[in-house]
């Protein structure tokens, strides 16, 4: 059979014939998914384009979660990243709420897998009643298990919150943050966490096979008045200088408004926002 002039391998551009499953020259699987960057039908099973090398977006480009009590979460790819490497969990547990937010370390491989593994593992552990330390250790093991070597070690930051009538327990490692937005003036947020970073901005604590010993920060607090707990990745907090948080609407409305602000400010990173109302009904 003669090659069809209109068909060529998207990787090596050699002619291929109708019905071929693989390119005879380079071995590329024909009919592969199309790359969102260069348009070639050349995406391999690992999610990379064999022509331009771009890693493809996941189904996490934009997602929202809302619980019956009003707590809400929004995560978005942003405007500059090829995929969303943030991950979040928001779970109802009796009269409380559990949230975990992890930001994949961009310099590590498969950072989106790291954040997803940490969030899934820690969220389930906290919802089952395990301590913050136990949940963190399990999440660390789940992320470390993704590594094929010390040079191929997916990594992510970590923050969790268990919130309920008795107060809030926060735990974190890295630079993903939590804020308290007081009910009388939610526009003025109070930072509750401390970043694990050096003066030039690089993080000094993370989850991953190459993280070494990581000391988990744990903080408990009992707000004396109604308000909202905000947990967010740096895709939001890097744009908070001079910003007043929304002062009205449901937590989902407020989270969407914060996302709009981050995107309007440049949207250079993935954005994840969780808002948990405490002490009163919002919206």
Segments and roles (model prediction):
Residues 1-283:
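PP2C/PPM-type serine/threonine phosphatase catalytic domain
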């Amino acid at each position: 059979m003669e090659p069809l002039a209109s068909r060529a391998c998207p990787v090596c551009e050699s002619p291929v014939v109708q019905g071929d499953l693989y390119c005879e020259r380079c071995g590329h699987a024909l009919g592969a998914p199309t790359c969102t960057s260069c348009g070639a039908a050349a995406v391999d099973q690992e999610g990379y384009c064999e022509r331009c090398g771009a890693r493809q977006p996941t189904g996490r480009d934009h997602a929202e979660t809302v619980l019956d009590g009003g707590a809400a979460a929004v995560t978005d790819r942003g405007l500059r990243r090829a995929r969303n490497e943030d991950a979040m969990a928001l779970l109802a547990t009796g009269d409380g709420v559990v949230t975990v937010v992890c930001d994949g370390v961009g310099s590590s491989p498969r950072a989106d897998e790291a954040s997803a593994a940490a969030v899934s593992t820690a969220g389930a552990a906290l919802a089952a009643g395990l301590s913050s330390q136990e949940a963190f250790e399990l999440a660390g093991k789940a992320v470390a298990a993704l590594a094929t070597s010390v040079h191929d070690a997916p990594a992510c930051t970590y923050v969790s919150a268990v919130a309920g009538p008795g107060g809030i327990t926060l735990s974190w490692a890295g630079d993903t943050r939590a804020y308290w937005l007081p009910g009388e003036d939610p526009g003025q947020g109070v930072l509750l966490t401390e970043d694990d970073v050096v003066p030039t901005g690089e993080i000094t604590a993370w989850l991953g096979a190459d993280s070494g010993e990581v000391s988990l920060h744990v903080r408990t607090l009992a707000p004396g008045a109604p308000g909202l707990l905000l947990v967010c990745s740096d895709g939001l907090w890097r744009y908070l200088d001079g910003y007043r948080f929304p002062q009205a609407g449901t937590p989902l409305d407020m989270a969407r408004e914060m996302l709009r602000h981050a995107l309007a400010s440049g949207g250079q990173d993935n954005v994840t926002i969780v808002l948990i109302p405490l002490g009163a009904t919002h919206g």
